Amino acid sequence: MPLRMSTLFLRTLRDDPAEAEVASHRLLVRAGYIRRAAPGIYSWLPLGLKVLAKVERIVREEMDAIGAQEVHFPALLPREPYEATGRWDEYGDGLFRLQDRRGNDYLLAPTHEEMFTLLVKDLYSSYKDLPAYLYQIQTKYRDEARPRAGLLRGREFIMKDSYSFTVDDAGLDAAYEAHRAAYLRIFDRLGLEVVPVRATSGAMGGSRSEEFLHPTEVGEDTFVESDGGYRANVEAVTTVAPAPLDEAAMAALPAAEVKDTPVSTTIAALVDVANQLAPREGEPWTAADTLKCVVVTAVVDGGERRPFVVGVPGDREVDLKRLEASVGSALGVVGEPTLEAATAADLAEHPALVKGYIGPAAVDAVEGTPVLGADDSVSGLPFFVDPRIAPGTAWITGANADQRHVFGLVAGRDFTWDGVLEATAVREGDEAPDGSGPLHTRRGMEMGHIFQLGRKYAEALDLKVLDVHGKQVVVTMGSYGIGITRAVAAIAERYHDDKGLAWPRAVAPADVHVVVATKGEDGLAAAETLAASLEAEGLTVLVDDRPKVSPGVKFKDAELIGVPTTVVIGRGLADGELELKDRATGEARPVPVDGAVAAVLAEVRDGR
């Protein structure tokens, strides 16, 4: 049976929703695919569910093709498995937590690693049972602080998550490559360009990790690529550090010297003063010769504020997002803390920090020479440095005293640090870590993420099997996710114009949109006959048979809804002609009534 717009639960809108930030959000609401229930939470209407089902079908077909089997877990999960893996705390405020009437703790699932692991533990005990690839398509919940952009950043969303269970690393590598290839096929069928890039693992843990990013200016992620093939999310880019000097070479460098540097609280002012006070022969001082020490505050679960200092070259900016990926473990806190610039109140608790003149070593105010003890750090706060601050590099940096700086302070000789972190923003033109050329930055939207989890969850939940020698071994796991609802939004973002959506045929809510643009029974009868013939050929049909709606409104709705092929039954019907229109190109041409089915089938087979 065709979908008839006279009875379809649908209301198109002429005005954009007030909260819409991106085209996909605006058009999916206006065209009647989704409706907002609350911030970050959406209801799916009949047309939206048809698109969603087609995306899910493609994902299922490709997962089944690699031997994965579908299961389905509850969304309401007990606390205990997540406590065993540490993620009850790691997720922090991102979890939706609740209690039953007896006071037992539960969560709404953000992911299901623990449940998959326990299921396999309950049922499998031998290497003969493995490998096993399991997947589900299910609703997830994350308490996003700032849900935005409609389906792109929500609190409730649908994901395909799959997990591989193998006896060893070789099996994990095979599972990873099988999923990687399946993902590329999925996105190709969805009509989405994706770029696989190196990524961090975040709260998921594990080793090898790749994101599949769809290049788009509305994407929240920045990634880089080189002409030589290096590709990575900026959070995963490793800095090319200078070669360190040995102790003898460092000892031979000139001693550090404290100088008065009036009115030099900015890097630019400091460089000007340095070139006046201590001009360097042959090459003037630049911002790259300075070491700026930035105070950052980590806000951990529960709101505790943990200030620390990070030293970076003066010509570089601190990237809080890159820092977040690694600073949690460096500070000894669980999970990824939220980072923000230190406030005046944070600085007030550490009076040794003189704003504008902070450096890695304290200053002896009487003698005027730097105190360069090997264990000194800034005011007792943890002190981390960017990889460019390598042993033997010399810097102009703050002396922790008003209008004073230290010249020639040598890293590793005159000061040490508590850790090396990727702290600075990646810039256009930076050298690729693998030497494959300069990096170019692009914006992208994360569509999928695959991880080699290794044995993290299996060890935490004691998932073991007997190997071929009868010895118990910890199972090796992989995790592979695709955002289903995000894929719908990404396709809408990619395939639209100023008139509305223009779905690729693989996911369109119908193959053909038949618009009855004449009055009387002849037009309706022709539409029913055409729809029946098209359905007999295996196509799905949406018929606009609304009796009290003008042709102009019907045409606008057809463009807004975005079915790939439109057949207009209009004035030409009296002469035995219909109009066939391609939504993507806007091209329209007349076709004879008795040749309409063949013409539509030709378009479908051509992939138009």
From Swiss-Prot:
It is found in: Cytoplasm. One of its GO terms (biological process) is prolyl-tRNA aminoacylation. The keyword Ribonucleoprotein does not apply. Keywords: Aminoacyl-tRNA synthetase, ATP-binding, Cytoplasm, Ligase, Nucleotide-binding, Protein biosynthesis. Its EC number is 6.1.1.15. It comes from the Bacteria. Its main location: cytoplasm. It is an enzyme of class 6 (ligase). Pfam families: HGTP_anticodon, tRNA-synt_2b, tRNA_edit. Coiled coil: none annotated. It catalyses: tRNA(Pro) + L-proline + ATP = L-prolyl-tRNA(Pro) + AMP + diphosphate. GO terms for cellular component: cytosol. One of its GO terms (molecular function) is proline-tRNA ligase activity. The keyword Nucleotide-binding applies. Homodimer. Consists of three domains: the N-terminal catalytic domain, the editing domain and the C-terminal anticodon-binding domain. Belongs to the class-II aminoacyl-tRNA synthetase family. ProS type 1 subfamily. Catalyzes the attachment of proline to tRNA(Pro) in a two-step reaction: proline is first activated by ATP to form Pro-AMP and then transferred to the acceptor end of tRNA(Pro). As ProRS can inadvertently accommodate and process non-cognate amino acids such as alanine and cysteine, to avoid such errors it has two additional distinct editing activities against alanine. One activity is designated as 'pretransfer' editing and involves the tRNA(Pro)-independent hydrolysis of activated Ala-AMP. This is Proline--tRNA ligase. The gene is proS.
